[in-house]
Every structure is written in C-alpha cells, then in structure tokens.
C-alpha cells in the first residue's frame, strides 16, 4: 500500500474540481489573467496534481513567513521551500489584483487558462531574508538567489486555486504520472515498498548499482523519478536525459523499477530542497527516499567554497524523519573496484583496494573529444545516447561576438573570418553585422540604452539558435554596454561556446579613418546617441581576445581568432 500523502490528504485539485470544470472555464474567460512564467507553470502543475500536498494554492504571507523562518506552514505542517506567485507592480495595477479578486492563471505557451486563484493577500517579501533563511546565503553565485533578485518580481500573491485543466505536454506523455496515477500504478503492480531516486543528471552504472543496492537492503522496488522541469543552468537537457533513463531501464531485473518524470522547478536548495523532495516523493507514494552526497547542491559560492556541506542534506532530512513519514536512505559516493568488477560505497572500501572513478568534468571532456568511455563506467547504449546529443568539439556550434567602436574594423574582421571559416568547412557559418541586424531584425529600434539592449538580446537569441544547431555565428554589433554583452554570453553558452573579441581600436583612429563621415555628422549634432561622441562605450573586462586594427591588419586579427578557436578544439579535423 502506498505511503499516505503529506498532511494526510492528497490535494488532487484536478480531480476535486472536475465536476465544475465547464463552469470554471466559462468564468475564467471573463476574468483578467496573470500569464505564468516557466517556474510558475512547474509550481502550478504540482499544486494542481497534489505533488505539493498539503498546498492548495500559492502561499499567502502567513504561510510564506512560517516556511521561510521555521519550515512550517501556518497550520503547522512541515514544508521547506516557499511556493509563491511573484508579480510586478504593473501586473497588479493592470490585472486589478487585490484581496478577494478572482484571477485566471494562464499558460504562456498556449494561452490556455489553467486555474483561477482567489487572492488572499498581496505582500512584498524581504528577499534578502528569504535568500539567507532558505538557501543559507545571499550570494548570487547561487542560481536560486540570482533568480530571486533578478528574475522574481517584487510582490507575491497568495491564495487558493481552483483547477480548470492540466498542463499540456507533448513529450514523454506516457511517463508523466500524477501522484494519484503513480499510486494506482504501484497498487496495480502490488508494490508495498518503493525507494524513490531523484536525479537531474544522466544515470550510469554506479547509479544502477546504488538503486539496486538500496532496493535489496529494504526489500523494495525502485522509482526512478528524474526532474524534467527546471534544473541547474548548464545541465544536460531533459530530452537527452530521458532517452538515457529509457536506455538504462532494461538493465534492471524485470519488475524491479519504474520510470516516471517529475515536472519540478528545482531551486538547488541543498538541505531545504532535500526535505522538499522527500515530501514530494511521499505524495507520489514512495516509502523510502535516497538522499545522496550534496543532494541538490548548486556547487561553489563566489569565494570558491561549497554552499553546503556534503552531508547537510542528509542531516536535514534525518532531523524530520518521523514527521516526514518517509524513510531516508543515505548513501555515499559509489566507486568501481576493477579487481572484482563491482561497485561499492566508498566508505566500505579498504584504503589499499584499487578503485576507479570518472568525474563529471572528465566525462564531459571525453564526450567532447570522442575519447573512449569504458563499460565499467557506463553502458554502451547510454553512451550512444549521450554521443548523439554531444557531438565532438569540432562538430559543435559556437559564436564569435566582436564589439568595438563604429569603424573600429570589426566588420572587416567579421567578413574575413566568415570567408576563412567557410573555406575551412565542416559547419555552416552565419554572419550578422550590426547594420544588417538593424535593418532586418531591429528596424523599429532607436539608440536609447533600452533599445540597444533589446537589439543585443535579439542578436544573442539568433546566435544561440545557430550555435545550438551546430553552426558558427559571427556577430559584430557595437554592443557598448557590459551588462548586455554578459547577457548575450549567458544566452549563447546554454548551447555552445561564446568568444568575446574586443576590437580595441582607439576612438581617435576610428574617427580619423572614417570615410563615411558619420563621426563628423555626430560631432556636428546631426546624429544623436552616437557611441564615442555623446554616448558611452564600456570597454569589456572579460574579453577572450583583444585586437587593435590601428596596430595590426585584418588578416592577422583573423588569424588570432582562428588560433583561439583551434585551441578550444573547434577547428580540429576529424
């Protein structure tokens, strides 16, 4: 029999409100709406299907305050992560958000109304306190803290929700079990004990050995329950990961394991997140939950120190084990013993026994370079999936982003680099000069700081898509502001390499060699907002390469860029 849900009752709002669906649908069509972000959609899905039981909506101020300070909802139930609906002042005013108001919650992807929230309250959180209490630090090297300060809006809206419809998914539909569906599935299979395994990474032989070992020790079955909502920036995409999990499943003894996907937006909150994960798995019917070393940790802070200790998460869940009602299965890192061809937890291996390990960094290197990945580490069918999604370095896309004053020589360098890379062959090459983008993509934009930032954001989006497709993107806007250049880097680096080339030709040289006379017009006041004349240029502090066409020619500058690309393995021939 499945584990009772957290709080005693599974808050399956989809099932609860099904008899009123048409009535709620008709009402929502007439209501003002809040369009939900990706994180809010993930949160709403787990509110609606009962994954976040005992929640029945987004937290009001009383619940939020209790969770932040004490891991407690207002009714005393344990809950460790704030589940909040953040909105801007503009949205509050436009939509008419106020206590007692009924607001539709709309899916940004297909414009469908998913639920109606009855507003309990609107409050302004202390985000510094939230960061320190929930995540243990206000350091923006933590992705959740960065999100809190730079993405989450300034006000939170609390209130219960009524379900109109479930979110629509088009990928792996057969693996997307709600808590109620998964409980029924366990019951159908006759499973009494279920060990849940949380992951946001591909699984290899060590993970299989770990989960089988946990099942054997508890005489239980295994739920592989990976997160396919939002994970840590830079993680492998969920499409690749799910194909890996599917490839791995036949390696389990028949009838031992089930794969189900969890649409969770992770916060990488370490100890607090581990408690939250345990609650979610309890709601899905699991009786046991594996908590590993540095569970849901975000890595290192801005000082190079881990945000959390390696076993802080295990300690946090153990502290609340009786109240959680789910047995924690702590585990050490598994290591391979070549002499006996087996995996064991590191704490069970004598110091004189030979062991082998491959780190995540080493695995990524081997995928990038095409080096062998041994069968003792991962199964051939898993490696095949990973290689399909991670081609060798010389088949990956990249972006070269040239920035500098008007007439600094960046356009000439970009054109010459375009010719050079096309001659090299092996991938398609796209050239996006500043003036081309202005005429084709950003013709309605002016030269205010806001419009310049929008222009760079559009360039970054196009470059990222080209990079993702394995192409070389060469872009050459003026891009005078550090913040927009950094945002461009972050956008592109989700999919491939980004190289910032500062064409540091001095302003006086660019102006002196200007044959088109644009600097003269700017000096005469005929052109306003001209970079270097009446608008600033913030020189890059983190350029990957600096060239100066007042001291070197275009051919030499291009050769320097080619050497940079070659040093990263991007131009190496197969």
Curated annotation (Swiss-Prot):
Name of the molecule in the record: Sulfate adenylyltransferase
Residues carrying the site annotation Induces change in substrate recognition on ATP binding: 331
Entry's EC annotation: 2.7.7.4
One Pfam family here: PUA_2
Family as reported in the entry's similarity comment: In the N-terminal section; belongs to the sulfate adenylyltransferase family. In the C-terminal section; belongs to the APS kinase family.
Region ranges (Catalytic): 171-395
Top EC class of this enzyme: transferase
Assembly behavior: Homohexamer. Dimer of trimers.
Segments of this protein annotated with the region Allosteric regulation domain: 396-574
InterPro entries documented for this protein: APS_kinase, ATP-Sase_PUA-like_dom, P-loop_NTPase, PUA-like_sf, Rossmann-like_a/b/a_fold, Sulf_adenylyltr_euk, Sulf_AdTrans/APS_kinase, Sulfurylase_cat_dom
Residues the record lists as binding ATP: 198-201, 292-295, 334
Activity regulation information from UniProt: Allosterically inhibited by 3'-phosphoadenosine 5'-phosphosulfate (PAPS).
Record's subcellular location: Cytoplasm
Binding annotation for sulfate: 198, 200, 296
GO biological process, one term: methionine biosynthetic process
Reaction(s) this enzyme catalyzes, per UniProt: sulfate + ATP + H(+) = adenosine 5'-phosphosulfate + diphosphate
